[in-house]
Swiss-Prot record:
Coiled coil: none annotated. Substrate binds at residues 104, 141. The keyword Membrane does not apply. Pathway: Amino-acid biosynthesis; L-lysine biosynthesis via DAP pathway; LL-2,6-diaminopimelate from (S)-tetrahydrodipicolinate (succinylase route): step 1/3. This is 2,3,4,5-tetrahydropyridine-2,6-dicarboxylate N-succinyltransferase. Homotrimer. The lineage of its organism: Bacteria, Pseudomonadati, Pseudomonadota, Gammaproteobacteria, Alteromonadales. One of its GO terms (biological process) is lysine biosynthetic process via diaminopimelate. It catalyses: (S)-2,3,4,5-tetrahydrodipicolinate + succinyl-CoA + H2O = (S)-2-succinylamino-6-oxoheptanedioate + CoA. It is found in: Cytoplasm. Gene3D superfamilies: Hexapeptide repeat proteins (2.160.10.10), Tetrahydrodipicolinate-N-succinyltransferase, N-terminal domain (1.10.166.10). It comes from Idiomarina loihiensis (strain ATCC BAA-735 / DSM 15497 / L2-TR).
Length: 274
């Protein structure tokens, strides 16, 4: 694996000289191997090590190189066709393979090759991009988007129209991460490498990027880029220093533990946010 890693790192430094006509079978095989391993869930662009998220930048480089190396090709999809560099994940699946991997995919959902879909995941008509990892038991609801290299944990609910930001460029940016047992409400957007920690509940219509103020009203503090575990978050606003106007903020209205969350429905938690 170290040889493959170094080959990809070296090639990425010369990426401007690489295109679909490049004759380098070793590089093509290395990139193909990495994409296949991400697709199977054996490799992840980001993973938790000793309680901290670690991003493997070389895997992002492999994904980017695949765009340089691959030419557009015809992709069949139901009643229509597509012209793209990345094939559909399920292009070669038959019923036996779908049953063996234990997922449910509802038409016209689109999952690109190089995205991992865990067991008991339900993919409604939605979009999952290359490099993403969707953990077992998760619901990707209708018109949700899971961006490139985004990491979605186990037993997560991504409600209708949710957007989880992708990140391939700029390369130094970290992927957006939704940890296990989170609920993301309809039409919410979590982007720019924000981490939503385990068991958090995000209400409908909450937008969080790296510059979004996340106000913890219980502790009277402002956070950036991270929603703490067990937080219940709703959209709101905070006043300006001179009191002339207010600007958007995400508001942590309460914290819940796993026991409370198991006993109380998501809607009840949000209705009692006051």
């Amino acid at each position: 694996m170290e040889n493959i890693k170094q080959r990809i790192i070296d090639a990425f430094e010369q990426r401007d000289q690489i295109n679909a006509r490049t004759e380098n079978d070793d590089l093509r095989e290395a990139v193909r191997y990495v994409i296949d391993e991400i697709d199977r869930g054996e490799l992840r662009v980001a993973e938790k090590v000793s309680g901290e998220w670690v991003v493997h930048q070389w895997l992002k480089k492999a994904v980017l190189l695949s765009f340089r190396l691959n030419d557009n090709d015809l992709i069949e999809g139901g009643e229509t066709r597509f012209w793209d560099k990345v094939p559909a994940k399920f292009a070669d699946y038959d019923s036996a393979r779908f049953r063996a991997e234990g997922m449910r995919v509802v038409p016209p959902a689109m999952v690109r090759k190089g995205a991992f879909i865990g067991r008991n995941v339900v993919v409604m008509p939605s979009y999952v991009n290359i490099g993403a990892h969707v953990g077992e038991g998760t619901m990707v609801d209708t018109w949700a988007t899971v961006g490139s290299c985004a990491q979605i944990g186990k037993n997560v609910h991504l409600s209708g129209g949710v957007g989880i930001g992708g990140v391939l460029e700029p390369l130094q940016a970290n992927p957006t991460i939704i940890e296990d047992n989170c609920f993301i409400g309809a039409r919410s957007e979590i982007v720019e490498g924000v981490i939503v920690e385990e068991g958090a509940v995000i209400s409908m219509g909450v937008y969080i990027g790296q510059s979004t103020r996340i106000y913890d009203r219980e502790n009277d503090r402002i956070l950036y880029g991270r929603v703490p575990s067990g937080s219940v978050v709703v959209p709101g606003s905070l006043p300006s220093a001179n009191g002339t106007h207010s600007l958007y903020a995400a508001i942590i209205v309460k914290r819940v533990d796993a026991k409370t969350r198991a006993k109380v429905g998501i809607n009840a938690l949000l209705r009692s946010a006051e």
